[in-house]
Amino acid sequence: ENKNAINADFTFTNGKLYFGTTAKTTDWYDNGAPFSYYVVTTSDDDKTKPDEEKIMKKVVESKTGKFYLKKGVVLGKYIVISDTAGTLTMIDTTNDKVTDTKDIGEAFSGNITYDEMTGTIYFVAGTNDLYGIKVSADGKLKDEKKVRLYETGYSATTPEVYNGKVYVSGSKGKAFQDKGYMAVADVSSDKYKVNYTVELSNYSQCEPTIVKTGENSVRVYFTINDEPGGIYAIEDSKDATSATLETVYEPTGD
């Protein structure tokens, strides 16, 4: 597939590397489909040679979405991947067979987070829609829930989950032009809900870092895609309905 480029994060599991392709040009809208997801074994098949050529095996082909900056998430013997068109695919890494697919019908640019405690994957797609999908022990994508984090804009970030809450950022409008937000969503009940959002000066496109600060409190660290390129945080607790944006570090000078 020489017309496309490998521009996805590598995922290593079960002695294999998994990765996908995207357009070889810098044009995001380049319709160079189909795009594919591959696997390569890392075993030393010929110990008499200092190097050897490996064969890329195609596992998934997408005619609508790319795998640009996409990273597979390991769930035991399975790996779940997504393309930018909103199709999720479960792969059994023992035989590299697809066990299930799910089309959510929304553009999906970020990556997936897995909560092992609840067996749920989380991601944001479309107009700031936070999804949670249960994954069964036999590699099937099951019950789906979602909640809209903000009514305008979008998010291409990867959420973080801790203790029944999901933390994720996005844009309220156009990226790098309009205000951004950091959202805290409760995913512990049957119906997801947004506890609150904190307005940011611009789009925050990063996976937040969660640090436990007490029995029922955490600190959420993240960056904002805007000058001066600082590090920021909010403090969240069990029953919080709001938070104050804190500046942790901002560079000065040129």
Task: Say what each PLM segment does.
Residues 3-11, 64-74, 106-116, 152-161, ...:
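Repeated scaffold domains used in trafficking and secretory/extracellular systems
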Residues 19-20, 81, 123, 168, ...:
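Residue position within the beta-strands of beta-propeller blades
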Residues 14-16, 76-78, 117-119, 163-165, ...:
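Short coil/turn segments that connect the beta-strands within blades of beta-propeller domains
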